[in-house]
UniProtKB/Swiss-Prot annotation:
[4Fe-4S] cluster binds at D36. Signal peptide: none annotated. Protochlorophyllide reductase is composed of three subunits; ChlL, ChlN and ChlB. Forms a heterotetramer of two ChlB and two ChlN subunits. Disulfide bonds: none annotated. Component of the dark-operative protochlorophyllide reductase (DPOR) that uses Mg-ATP and reduced ferredoxin to reduce ring D of protochlorophyllide (Pchlide) to form chlorophyllide a (Chlide). This reaction is light-independent. The NB-protein (ChlN-ChlB) is the catalytic component of the complex. Its cofactor is [4Fe-4S] cluster. It catalyses: chlorophyllide a + oxidized 2[4Fe-4S]-[ferredoxin] + 2 ADP + 2 phosphate = protochlorophyllide a + reduced 2[4Fe-4S]-[ferredoxin] + 2 ATP + 2 H2O. The lineage of its organism: Bacteria, Bacillati, Cyanobacteriota, Cyanophyceae, Nostocales. Pathway: Porphyrin-containing compound metabolism; chlorophyll biosynthesis (light-independent). This is Light-independent protochlorophyllide reductase subunit B. Belongs to the ChlB/BchB/BchZ family.
Amino acid sequence: MKLAYWMYAGPAHIGTLRVATSFKNVHAIMHAPLGDDYFNVMRSMLSRERDFTPVTTSVVDRHVLARGSQEKVVDNITRKDAEERPDLIVLTPTCTSSILQEDLENFVERAQLEAKGDVLLADVNHYRVNELQAGDRTLHQIVQYYIEKARKKGELPEGKTAKPSVNIIGISTLGFHNNHDCTELKRLMADLGIEVNAVIPEGASVHELKNLPRAWFNLVPYRELGLMTANYLEKEFGTPCIDIVPMGVVETARCIRKIQEVINAQGADVNYEDYINEQTLYVSQAAWFSRSIDCQNLTGKKAVVFGDNTHAAALTKILSREMGIHVVWAGTYCKYDADWFREQVSEYCDEVLITEDHGEIGDAIARVEPSAIFGTQMERHVGKRLDIPCGVIAAPIHVQNFPIGYKPFLGYEGTNQITDLIYNSFTLGMEDHLLEIFGGHDTKEVITKGISAGSDLSWTKDGLAELNKIPGFVRGKVKRNTEKFARDRGFKDISAEVLYAAKEAVGA
């Protein structure tokens, strides 16, 4: 166990709660001490949900430690069942309350005797998995529970839908642009003449889960959530799974061609080539833009990418393959799925980084001095400290990345949004320099610290004054070169003289 003040993927119970609260009329009960219950605040504040978060904390306090939890947990489940009338109550411990090693399965069985709705214990090992793995496991568990229940009652529908149809699996609360992506995927499916059989878990009722086997195929747009469920449905009912992420012009076309292949194999007769052609050439602006003079200005510029597997891999491919940008390194914090990530991006970048340590990522960014960063909220902070622009492309994210306006990342409209994000993330031409010449709003002081805490150098007043005279678009590089020169020569204070000496050394 390690103390962390920043985590890319949260603890396991956050993943379980994200899935449970995405469903309609499902209530979650968290068996946890106060302090583990920040999910309610996070969901209502960040994703701007209108409804109250359906999560109740069954608090582990000194009374519970003295007497045991059974009475309190069972009371909370039956009380919420009577008050809220949910279809399902999901009980989850947290990594903290798991230390008590209580028989929660027994508590659930006790509560089920009195509760009118279903009660389920989230089957997750809180020490072994993170938020993303736990979410995937919980979704699979809920789907399996209701399909088995329908099978026992003889209520499982037979056969497929009359027209080609799809289950979109993995849209959840607190996901990165998930609602916009869902709208765009529905629009894409409508264009292709495919009905949407179900979207899970976001907005779905647990009573609809028995209809999942009726779809012709399952689409899993995000690798982090939904693969276990899709694999289960494929194993049980033979429903094909498509896990190609339709992000960027090339991958969207590949995904559509795979859909064509899958539904034609089941008796349909469709050809989507004309649709792909029209969208690529006339509807999506990305293909046209990538050939324009604006985009050619970006050719060879250096960028770094970091995020979850889905978004980091897709962005790396788009930057390198579609826009000609040099990706110095690409990284992910999904260590459990590192092999897939390496396989996807190794030919599109110089180096692959797999880590959960934000300090290591910050240092890697400072080392390569890219023109732009594409990452999470943490990389945005790093970019601000290093004066390098950053486009946010993956969770974890802050409230400004839950936009109210329509901003999908998937499908053809998604390609436009991503192109805008990439282009606007690079500093344009002489922008900084012109602001300084004409006395614009750019009056910020020079940042003199590295990313890793505890810099051993300090700048004198005359040294800073001299550094401020250097144009903004090269100032960061000059500062770093000067600090390297000072370290090599053993200077502790960097004065104007040291700056001049460093300039001469570099010039020589």
